[in-house]
Amino acid sequence: YVINLSVKLAIVMLLFVINLRFMIPNGENTAIKSDLNILFVIDKSVSMKALDYNGSEERFEGVVNDSCSIVDELSGCKFSIITFGDEAQRVIPFTTDSDMVQAELKSIALEDDYYAGGSSMNLARDTLEKTLKEESKRQNGNAKFVVFFLSDGEITKEGETLETFSDIKQYVTNGAVLGYGTSTGGKMVSSLYTDTPDSPNYYINYYDDNYNRVTAISKLDEKNLKQI
């Protein structure tokens, strides 16, 4: 479901309390030594460019900010990242190197709207299931996985509907679906723009059935996020 930042942080602190093993002071910060595996599943599709986060910022700014906050709060756990759009891939294996994880989060590039083939959350589902199965086996079935799924819920791959995630829950100890965007939606700046915001080519656009140029608007899909 869609939740604001304060609730997101409350969830993080709940996980912190439930799964804390012991803590070791580490300079100014306190590191958590834990058997938790934190897995981010991050939407990097074109719609995450929509300018309706925190007023008029890019949705993906929210994703990066919240993910980095989670890494800070759960420093000492193991982290891994899956990204998805028109394809899905695991970009880093599980690691306790928080600095590397945050650097990777900040370096994720959104898809180019000129080449993008439509976003698919089913690809994310398949990659997530594969990762959880492999890591569970590698860690002899003793691993605890916390999954954070960060997306606007929008599926743009033609003819696709969301598949069930229910058969994955056997591998997941806890987690949250974090939603980004609004029901009214937002415009997306084109990766090909060369002009100013008042130019018709600045934002992603398309031609409707009557061959009229229309500015594309991406809207949050709460139904898909709630289903996950």
Feature roles, as predicted:
Residues 28-36, 47-79, 95-96:
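…and closely analogous acidic/polar surface helices at protein-protein or active-site interfaces
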Residues 15, 43-45, 81, 128, ...:
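DG-centered beta-turn motif at the end of beta-strands
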Residues 60, 64-68, 98, 102, ...:
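Extracytoplasmic/secreted envelope proteins and their assembly/folding machinery
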Residues 75-79, 143-144, 171-175:
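Loop/turn elements at helix/coil->beta-strand transitions in domains of secreted/extracellular proteins
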Residues 153-226:
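VWA/integrin I-like adhesion module and closely mimicked acidic/polar interface patches used
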Residues 22-24, 89-143, 181-188:
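Von Willebrand factor
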Residues 1-39, 45-53:
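Acidic, polar low-complexity linker/tail segments
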Residues 48-60, 68-69, 86-91, 108-118, ...:
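Second-shell loop/turn segments in exported
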